[in-house]
């Protein structure tokens, strides 16, 4: 593998070589996970036991409840929703780590939904269906919010476009991906609007269907409406970066620029979160998940928390949202913060070529 990669690099096939390395990494990770937890993956999620243990724990700080979505789910089915793959170090090559001025005075509580109330996208709760597309949702939703905050334009960008068209550069689509790669993709390739390439069809089923699990959709590079051109619908990022893993830097980033994407480790008990400030109480480590962080505060019990929007529908959690302990790197949430700034090249104008010709020349 190493010799082949060296030869490929000398022939300028950098992206193909990187794809081989990432594919090999993911294959080894997948085999290890299957061998270590095959019995666990086929077992049922223990709703009764987990809900009881959390709610009877006086120090839990949060409440659990039965969730119909996971009523008859195996651990493997739950794991399909958790699409953050272990990110190869190569993905962070050249990615800056952003910190902020420590003299910036931050409020004790902050909610992006009220701070930028004109931006309706911030308060949207979506549903990723049975696809491990959380890495794409967290990125696309945060970038949509940032376009509104910076340019005063309400725009919903397409999760489906990123999921289908980023390919091996972002990971494996519905089988998981790398959050930072999504932000790098925005910078170099852009993403179309949801109107151009929707994630949900008109029956309410998740694209491409309502199966228990479904494959990554194909990249069409064509808007569903004949009145739009795919290239003209593109919106771009101007940067992609990691935020320094300190609560003050994360708060400053959200306060100045808007919601960010965060990745964290999910345990079985998280599936049953209902209210309060989450911290891991019981259950096995299931996988990595990505969501949108929109604010922070302190509970009545004095527990500092982050406020986040999940994409498991409003029937999950606290109307689709959850709070998690802040300042202790709970479940690794403060070590996986990525973001980027929107570009004023958000719409490419003056393109008169048909999408059919654009696809053939891409």
From Swiss-Prot:
GO terms for biological process: defense response; proteolysis. Belongs to the peptidase C1 family. The keyword Protein transport does not apply. Keywords: Disulfide bond, Glycoprotein, Hydrolase, Plant defense, Protease, Signal, Thiol protease, Vacuole. Gene3D superfamilies: Cysteine proteinases (3.90.70.10). Its EC number is 3.4.22.-. Residues 1-33 form the signal peptide. One of its GO terms (molecular function) is cysteine-type endopeptidase activity. Residues 34-105, 346-362 form a propeptide. It is an enzyme of class 3 (hydrolase). Thiol protease that plays a central role in plant programmed cell death (PCD). In addition to its role in protein degradation, may cleave and/or degrade a number of target proteins, activating signaling towards PCD. Contributes to the increase of caspase-3-like activity after UV-C-induced PCD and is required for abiotic stress-induced PCD. Functions redundantly with CATHB1 and CATHB3 in basal defense and distinct forms of plant programmed cell death (PCD). Participates in the establishment of basal resistance against the bacterial pathogen Pseudomonase syringae pv. tomato DC3000. This is Cathepsin B-like protease 2. It is found in: Vacuole. The gene is CATHB2. Induction: By dark-induced senescence. Induced by infection with an avirulent strain of the bacterial pathogen Pseudomonase syringae pv. tomato DC3000. It comes from Arabidopsis thaliana. Its main location: other. PROSITE patterns: THIOL_PROTEASE_CYS, THIOL_PROTEASE_HIS. One of its GO terms (cellular component) is plant-type vacuole. InterPro entries: Papain-like_cys_pep_sf, Pept_cys_AS, Pept_his_AS, Peptidase_C1A, Peptidase_C1A_C, Propeptide_C1A. Disulfide bonds join 119-148, 131-174, 165-219, 166-170, 196-223, 205-210. Glycans are attached at residues 35, 72, 154, 313. The active site is at residues 134, 289, 310. Expressed in roots, leaves, stems and flowers.
């Amino acid at each position: 593998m190493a010799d082949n990669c060296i030869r490929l690099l000398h022939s300028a096939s950098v992206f193909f070589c990187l794809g081989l390395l990432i594919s090999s990494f993911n294959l080894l990770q997948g085999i290890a996970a299957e061998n270590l937890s095959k019995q666990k993956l086929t077992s049922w999620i223990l709703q009764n036991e987990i809900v009881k243990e959390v709610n009877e724990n006086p120090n839990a700080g949060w409440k659990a409840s039965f969730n119909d979505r996971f009523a008859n789910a195996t651990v493997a089915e739950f794991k399909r929703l958790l699409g953050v793959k272990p990110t190869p170090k190569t993905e962070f090559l050249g990615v800056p780590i952003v910190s902020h001025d420590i003299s910036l005075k931050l409020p004790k509580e902050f909610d992006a939904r009220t701070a930028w109330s004109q931006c309706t996208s911030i308060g949207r709760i979506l549903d990723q269906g049975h696809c491990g597309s959380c890495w794409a949702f967290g990125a696309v939703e945060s970038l949509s919010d940032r376009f509104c905050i910076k340019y005063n334009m309400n725009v919903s960008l397409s999760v489906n476009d990123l999921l289908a068209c980023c390919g091996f550069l972002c990971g494996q689509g519905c089988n998981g991906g790398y959050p930072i790669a999504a932000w790098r993709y925005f910078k170099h390739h852009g993403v179309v609007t949801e109107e151009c390439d929707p994630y949900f069809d008109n029956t309410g089923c998740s694209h491409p269907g309502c199966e228990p699990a479904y494959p990554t959709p194909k990249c069409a590079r064509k808007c569903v409406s004949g009145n739009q051109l795919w290239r003209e619908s593109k919106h771009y990022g101007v940067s992609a970066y990691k935020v320094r893993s300190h609560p003050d830097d994360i708060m400053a980033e959200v306060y100045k620029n808007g919601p960010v994407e965060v990745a964290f480790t999910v345990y079985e008990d998280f599936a049953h979160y209902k209210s309060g400030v989450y911290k891991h109480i019981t259950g096995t480590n299931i996988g990595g998940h990505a969501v949108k962080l929109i604010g922070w505060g302190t509970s009545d019990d004095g527990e500092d928390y982050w406020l986040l929007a999940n994409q498991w529908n409003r029937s999950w959690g606290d109307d689709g949202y959850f709070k998690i302990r802040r300042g202790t790197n709970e479940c690794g949430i403060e070590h996986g913060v990525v973001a980027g700034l929107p570009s004023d090249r958000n719409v490419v104008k003056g393109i008169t070529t048909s999408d059919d010709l654009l696809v053939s020349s891409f």
